[in-house]
Amino acid sequence: MELKMPALAIWSPEDEVLGAIAPLALGVAAGTALIVDLDVAGPKYAGDLTLASLVADGPTKSDLSPQRRGIAVVRNGGVDPEDAEQVLRALVDGWPAVVFRLPADHIGGDGAIPILPLIPGSMLNRPAGPAVYQRAGWRVRVPEGGIVLPRPRSGTIAALLAGRVPHPGDRWIRAWRRVWEQSWA
């Protein structure tokens, strides 16, 4: 798989669960990736490493590049992303793929990719431009420029929510590879 961009910023303004698991799925789809939560009030991902500690103590050599294949997660820990800019740049330089998880109230318009449930109707105020859509139980026309993910298996979601990595051959995980392969610029 060819990564068009080594770092992607995503957010899910409409679905909190999707906002928590999408960065993990995107990381698993890349093979080896770092997921960095830029949301001060983000999910309680497993692990001890936080962006706040990397800013306060400085990253170690082992923080700046993968030590094994798979995903690593950096929880936020209460730091504003603007205060972490140097650390974030160093992480992007050292990792083959980085996923930045943005808060649900992110405004957009800065190249970040919205992850949205594919639901009928027009009640929701959707961000303009391309997006990743999560198929739900309805047949809905896909907005132009969007990537549509198939419905995930319940075991896949359960694994991600429990801090386990689903099989990389999982249909839903494989579908996330298209997000890496797309040119979002």
Task: Set out the residue ranges of the language-model regions.
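C-terminal lobe/tail of nucleotide-utilizing enzymes
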Residues: 1-9, 130-185
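Glycine-rich P-loop/Walker A and Walker A-like loops and their local beta1-loop-alpha1 context
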Residues: 3-28
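P-loop/Walker-type NTP enzyme "switch/lid" segment
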Residues: 6-15, 34-97, 104, 155, ...
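Active-site-adjacent loop/helix micro-motif of nuclease/hydrolase catalytic cores
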Residues: 18-21, 82-86, 121-126, 140-141
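Hydrophobic anchor at the start of a short beta-strand
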Residues: 32-33, 98, 112, 130-131
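Cofactor-binding loop segments of dinucleotide-utilizing enzymes, especially the Rossmann-like FAD-
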Residues: 38, 117-120, 136
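Short, charged/polar "capping" segments at the starts of alpha-helices
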Residues: 42-45, 108, 121-126, 138-143
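Inter-motif core of Ras-like GTPase G domains
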Residues: 93, 104-129
